[in-house]
Amino acid sequence: MFVMRKLIFLLSALLLCAGCDKNEGEPLDMAEQTRINNQFLGLWQEVDHPRHQCKYRGFHSNFKYTSFLLMLHSGDKLPSTYDGKPYHFEKGPECSKGTVYTLVLDNRLKEFICKYNGLLYMWWQENSDPDKYVGNPDYAYERN
């Protein structure tokens, strides 16, 4: 009887730990933050944009976000609300095409982010299917 209880306890603990790394929103340590950030460093330009404007997003080693809209005819640069704000990463939802992270901007706004086939994909829809966005040019950015 004692052996059976011990075995059940061990199996329960193993099953619990097996799902540990799939928790969305789980905080990541600084080494993991840096490893993830290194994938996204630099300025990224919207792939499929209107003729008159283009969105840019940037990631820096000091974890400060760059985001602006460039008006192509005039050259005017319009910064977003989150331009220059701090950011960090959390675990995101499962995706068959790549690893999705939750990008938390200024400890308020959460967006999903994934690098796939050399492009960056970003979207904000909560409870969405990442496979719908990753690979879709409407959500793609290329390194500038």
Where are these regions (language model features)?
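C-terminal motif of bacterial Sec signal peptides marking the signal peptidase cleavage site
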Residues: 16-19
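Edge beta-strand at a domain terminus
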Residues: 25-29, 80-91, 123-144
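Positively charged n-region of N-terminal signal peptides that target proteins for export
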Residues: 1-7
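Short, conserved catalytic or interaction motifs in soluble domains
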Residues: 22
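Sec-dependent signal peptide hydrophobic core
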Residues: 8-12
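Contiguous, well-ordered beta-strand patches that form the walls/edges
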Residues: 50-55, 66-119, 123-126
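N-terminal helix-cap/turn-to-beta initiation motif at the start of protein domains
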Residues: 26-45
